Amino acid sequence: MSKAELKDFTFKSRHIGPTNEDEALMLQHLGYENSEEFISSVIPNEIFDSENNVVSIPDGCDQNKALKEINIISKKNVEHRSLIGLGYHSTVIPPVIQRNVLENPNWYTAYTPYQAEISQGRLEALFNFQTLISELTGLPISNASLLDEATAAAEAISLSLAVRKNKNANKFLVDQEILPQTFDVLKTRCEPLGISLEMFENNNFEIDKNIFGILIQLPGKNGRIWDPTKIINDAHKCNAIVTIAIDPLAQVLIKPMGEFGADIVVGSAQRFGVPIACGGPHAAFFATKEIYKRQIPGRIVGQSVDVEGNQALRLALQTREQHIRRDKATSNICTAQVLLAVLSSFYAVHHGPKGLKQIAENVVKYRSNFESILMNLEYPIEKYSAFDSVDVYCSEASEVIQLASEEGYNFRVLPIGSDFENAKGFGVTFDELTCDEEIYTLHQILAQVKGKKAHDLSNFLNENASLVDIPLREKSWLEQSVFNQYQSETDLMRYIHSLVSKDFSLVQGMIPLGSCTMKLNSAAELLPIEWREFSSIHPFAPHAQLAGFHEIINDLENWLSALTGFQGVSLQPNAGSQGEFAGLLVIRSWHQSLGEGHRNICLIPTSAHGTNPASAVMSGFKVVSVKCDEYGNVDLEDLKNKSKIHSKNLAALMVTYPSTHGVFEPNIREMCQVIHQEGGQVYLDGANLNAQVGICRPGSYGIDVCHLNLHKTFSIPHGGGGPGVGPIAVADHLVPYLPGHSIIKCGGEKAISAVSAAPFGSAGILPISWMYIRMMGSDGLRKASSIAILSANYLAKRLDPYYPVLFKDPNGLVAHECILDLRPLKSQLGIEVEDVAKRLMDYGFHAPTISWPVAGTLMVEPTESESLPELDRFCDAMIGIREEIEQIKLGKIDPINNPLKQSPHTLKRVTSDDWDRPYSRKEAAYPLPDQEKYKFWPSVSRINNAYGDRNLICSCPSVQDLEDINSV
C-alpha cells in the first residue's frame, strides 16, 4: 500500500467529514480550483499565514500511537490515595452511570438545551439536580450548575451586592475556615469592584452597617461544624445577606441551611460521584430564596407546558442572562458544568436518600474512630465537632506525612501550602472510599512514628458515632419518586436511556449552531480521562506526583502559544466567560503597573457576545459600545472617534474574529493599531478560533490577549452545557500577569490572583485537547480550519437563493459560519424564525443559532466534521421548509394551521385519532425522503415559554407538596 493510500487512515481523515473528492466538488461549486486559492480569497492577505510554520507541533498520527504516548505520560503521575480534602474528595462513580452517561455520546455531545423540545431528557436530569440541591439546602430556587465552588461563592457576593439595602455598603466578611482556593477567587472578584473583603474569626463579628454580606464555610476547611444560628441572626440585624458554603455529603445529615435562615447556599457536588481529576471539572451549585430568583446566576430549568397542555421542561428566566442583558446581566456565566451535574444527579438517584445517609454516616464514623486512635497514641489534637476531617499540630508532622506517603497516602500539610519538610502539622479527611482496612493502615503509620505498636482496631471502632454541636436533619427528604425507585441497576439503566432517547445530540445528526463549533468529539480523545492515573489525582498533591499532568499542561501551553502566535498561556480559566474575565484582569494589572490604573474604558462592538460586556463590568471597566456598519464589520470611524474621546482612560477593545457576523474583517490590523496608539490593549474573543487555527495567528496581527475555547476549537465535548475550558494566551508583555494560585505555584511573576478554584482549572479534561492536537498535527489543524470555512461557504452558496446570506466579504464569501436572513418572511407572511427552528426538528435537525447576533436570523456553523451528504441533507431540509413557506405565500396552506406554525410534531400527536390538520401526517412527520428509515421524534410539542416564567417551578414537588396540592 502506498504512502498516499495510508494517509486515508490517519486520524485527520477520521475527524474531517468531507473526503478529498467531496472537497473538490465543494470547491467547484464555489468556483475554485484548489483549497489554497479558496482560503487566500477568504482570509485577508495582511494576516494570512501562507507558510503554516508551526514547527513546534509534532506531525499528526493515528489513534493508537497517540494513545500509547499519552499512556506513557499518564504513568508519570503517582496515584496515591488522597486524604487531603480541601474540597476535593475520592468518590465512586457507579459503573452503571459511568457506562451509560459518562461514556455515552448521546449525553456528552449534546448542546445547551435552548431547543427544549428536543432536550427533555437532559432537562429532566438537571431538574433532578436542582431538586437534589433544594432538598439538601432547604432553599426553593437552585440553578443547574456553576463552574466550581469558588466561582459559586463569588457569584454569591455579586448577588448580595446587587440586592443590598444600603447601597453604600461595601464590606463582605468571610469565615476564617473558608477553603483557601475559594478565598483566592473571592479576592479576584472583589478587588475590581471596590469591595472590601475581610475575614472574621471564632464565629463572631461586629455588627456594621457597611457589611452587605457574609460567607460561612460549614463544615470548615478542617471539617469543623457548629450551629450557625447566632451568626446568621447577627448578620441579618445589619441587613447582610448570609451565604453558606456547604459540603453536600455533610448536608445529608445536618439540618438544611435554609432552615437556619441562610439566604444563599453554595458548594460543589463533586462528592456525588465525580472523580477528583486534578481539580475538575465538577458541578458547583447555587441555591437561594424565592425573592432572589431573578438575580440568581447561571441557568435554571423550569417546568412549563406545551401547546397541547402536556408538562414540559425548559430553561427559565433567561432574561437574567448575559446573552440578553449583556453588561446588566446577573453574571457572565455561559458554559457551566451540565454533564457533571447530570452525573451527580444520577448518583443521587442511584443511592437514594438511604444510600446517601449511609455513606455520610460512614464518613462520620471513620473520622471519630481516627480521632480515638490519635488520642490513644497521644497525638495532641484539639477536640471539636467535625464531619470528615482531623487536624493535628505536632513536632512529628513531617515524619508522619513522609511515612504516609511511603505507604501510598497523601495527608494534608499544615499550614496549607507548605512543603512537608516545613510542616507544623498534618490533616486527614475521610470519604466514601474509607474502610476498616484503611483505618488500620493509618493506625500503623501513626503508631510507628510514635515508636508504639498498633492495637486491635476493635478498641477504637465505634459504629454509633454521630455529629454533635449542630442540629441534624429531622424531616424526611428526597421523597420524590425519582430518588426512590431506581436503585436496581436494571431500572436505573432503563431510566437513563428513557431520558437520553428524548435528546438530540451529534449522535442523531448535525448541530449547526453558529458560534458554538459542534465538531466531533472522538472516542480516542475521551478514553484517557477515565484512566485512574488522571482521574484520581488531587490538585494539591505533591508536585512530584503530578509529572504526567505537568507534561500535558506544558505541551498544551506550548502548542497553543505556537498556534496563536503568543508567548504565554494559562489553562486555569474553566470556561470562556472566565477566560474573558482573566484576560481583562491581566490587561487591568498591566495598566496599573504602568501607573495608569485610571484606564477603565472598554470598547465593545454592538455585535459582541453577551459575555463580553458582562465580563468587562466584572473586571471593573465601563463599557462603551462601538457601532457596526451595514456589512457587519466594526465601524472603523466610530472606533477611531470613541478611541479619541476616551483616549486618557481607554483600557481595551474586545473584539471577536472572525466577527460574530461571520466574516473576516479586512481592517483587523488597523483596528489594533488604533487602540494601541491611544494606549489601550486589544482582547480577542476566541469563540471563532476554529476558522483561524493553522491559517492565521492573532498574536501576529496585533492582538494582546485572547481566550480559546477548548470545548469548541479543540474538541472537548460540550456536555449539554459544560464542561468547558477557556485558557488565555497573551503577548510577551502580559505574561508576568497570568493567573496564580495561593496553594500551587503557577502563573506569572506578577500574577493576578486565581480565577478558578484549581490551579490548572479543569485539568481532568485537558488530555482530550492534547489528544486532538497530537493526532491532527499542524497540517491537520490547518486542514480542519480550511474545511470548516469551505463547508460554511458551501452551505451559504446553496441556501442564499432561498434565505439571503446577510453578511459577506468583498469576495462574496463568509468565514466558518453564515447568517441567514429570515426577517422578510416575518414581515410578509408572519413566519417567525422560531417557526423554522421548530420545523427543522421534524426534518431531523437541531436548529442553528436563533436571532443572534441579529434578530430574525439563523446563524449556521457546520464545522469540519460533517460530511458532504450531511451538509446536503441540511440544505435539503432548509430548502424544503422554504418551499412550505412558498405554499403559504401562494395561499395553498393555511397561514396558521400549517406544518411550520404547528411544529414540532410528536409521535403522540401524529398517531392520535383526532388528526385535524389540513396537511397529512406524512407531511408533518416525514418531510424528507427516506426519513421513515430513521426518525428522531421530539418528545413534546412547542413549549409555552411565557407560562413557564410566570409560574416558575424549578424542582420536583415533595410527597407532602403533592398531598397538599391534591387536598385543595
Curated annotation (Swiss-Prot):
Its EC number is 1.4.4.2. One of its GO terms (molecular function) is glycine dehydrogenase (decarboxylating) activity. CDD domains: GDC-P (cd00613). HAMAP family: GcvP. This is Glycine dehydrogenase (decarboxylating). The modification N6-(pyridoxal phosphate)lysine is found at residue 712. It is an enzyme of class 1 (oxidoreductase). The keyword Oxidoreductase applies. It holds the Pfam family GcvP2_C. Belongs to the GcvP family. One of its GO terms (biological process) is glycine decarboxylation via glycine cleavage system. The glycine cleavage system is composed of four proteins: P, T, L and H. Gene3D superfamilies: Aspartate Aminotransferase, domain 1 (3.90.1150.10), Type I PLP-dependent aspartate aminotransferase-like (Major domain) (3.40.640.10). InterPro entries: GcvP, GDC-P_C, GDC-P_N, GDC_P, PyrdxlP-dep_Trfase, PyrdxlP-dep_Trfase_major, PyrdxlP-dep_Trfase_small. Signal peptide: none annotated. Keywords: Oxidoreductase, Pyridoxal phosphate. The glycine cleavage system catalyzes the degradation of glycine. The P protein binds the alpha-amino group of glycine through its pyridoxal phosphate cofactor; CO(2) is released and the remaining methylamine moiety is then transferred to the lipoamide cofactor of the H protein.
